[in-house]
Amino acid sequence: MPPTYNKAFIPLESNPEVFNELISLLGAPPSLQFEDIFTLDDPALLPDKILALVLIFPTTPTFEARLTAEEAGAQDWMVEHNEEDEDAMWFKQTINNACGLYAILHALANGRAKDFLRPGSLLDNLLSITAPMDPAQAAMALEASTELENAYSSIAIKGETAAPSSAEDEVDFHYISFVKSPDTGHLYELDGDRKGPVDRGVPDEEQRVDLGQKSLDVVRQFIAQGGDNIGFSLMALVEKA
């Protein structure tokens, strides 16, 4: 059964320049930037410090079938909310076509990235408000934030492709994030359309802070499960010198 939403936004273009404009408004400094990743197979072409990955992919029948099967067994992978010991900050998506926004929020709210946020910035304040809340309350707080909606709307109309005529128009692409807990080394797949954060284990024992090669292998496996579809694209949130 497809998710139901309470409101709708114009979709965000998968463009690093657009993403970087938005994260600047949210409170990220210039030292945090998104950039395109064109290959996962050549380490020489990958950034040194990957704080998060955002994967954009088509919502094909193959993906929908796999999602349904995994959701049926959610008790095997879902991380329960624990206010006292939260290893991954996850937001339930309640805004249609805003998966790009949720991917950005997940990338910035987890791992080392959250330590870069400007104190008192839009996202820093939202994270302070939502941290003690359960997922349903946190989702409603994001949905009700006029400041967040205004920042997003000012950027979503930009990009190289024309925005849909209506925010309610459905799009066939979805965004998810992969982040690392610096405390435990666990890799999390964060998708606002799922029942909770997906714990993908500790792939990088030797690199427990940022995403290392074995974390990238998990993303490769996700892409491979899409079969012959070539509609995937990938962006990395990186720390610049």
What are these regions (language model features)?
Residues 1-241:
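Cysteine-dependent deubiquitinase/ubiquitin-like isopeptidase catalytic cores across multiple families
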